[in-house]
């Protein structure tokens, strides 16, 4: 509840987002063509990366948010490496209006997880014999909006 100007009334409990835990749920790195894939290449490989966010309400005010990052590098249609990471966090969110929960859970929580997931992937790729893969920043706001638009389109389709 607000006092009319968008701020909570004086004495109202303030919103809180707490990170209770962060953990790797699944990590896979494949280098199926080693050692030939480790030889110097004339041009850089083609790299593709897919990122998804899932969230589950696991207890009152607690959400498990999982950031899934899958990717591969190919050179001349030959797989150099492939990786998959499911990195999750357990978040406690209190004193937040129900209508504000989805963006908080699907934007802010993955934004907090991403730097850790990025480091895990960079290290796994480096340990696989390649230069570390530094993932570009992710627009979680854009991902959230696309998902909302997709859901709205599905709901508007006639049965």
Curated annotation (Swiss-Prot):
This protein's record includes keyword Ribonucleoprotein: no
Top-rank taxon, per record: Bacteria
SUPFAM superfamilies linked: SecB-like (SSF54611)
A molecular-function term among this protein's GO annotations: unfolded protein binding
Keywords: Chaperone, Cytoplasm, Protein transport, Translocation, Transport
Keyword Transport annotated: yes
Subcellular location(s) of the protein: Cytoplasm
Pfam family, one: SecB
GO cellular component: cytoplasm
GO biological process, one term: protein folding
Summary of subunit composition and partner proteins: Homotetramer, a dimer of dimers. One homotetramer interacts with 1 SecA dimer.
Function statement: One of the proteins required for the normal export of preproteins out of the cell cytoplasm. It is a molecular chaperone that binds to a subset of precursor proteins, maintaining them in a translocation-competent state. It also specifically binds to its receptor SecA.
Homology family: Belongs to the SecB family.
Protein's UniProt name: Protein-export protein SecB
Organism: Nitrobacter hamburgensis (strain DSM 10229 / NCIMB 13809 / X14)
Lineage: Bacteria, Pseudomonadati, Pseudomonadota, Alphaproteobacteria, Hyphomicrobiales
Gene: secB
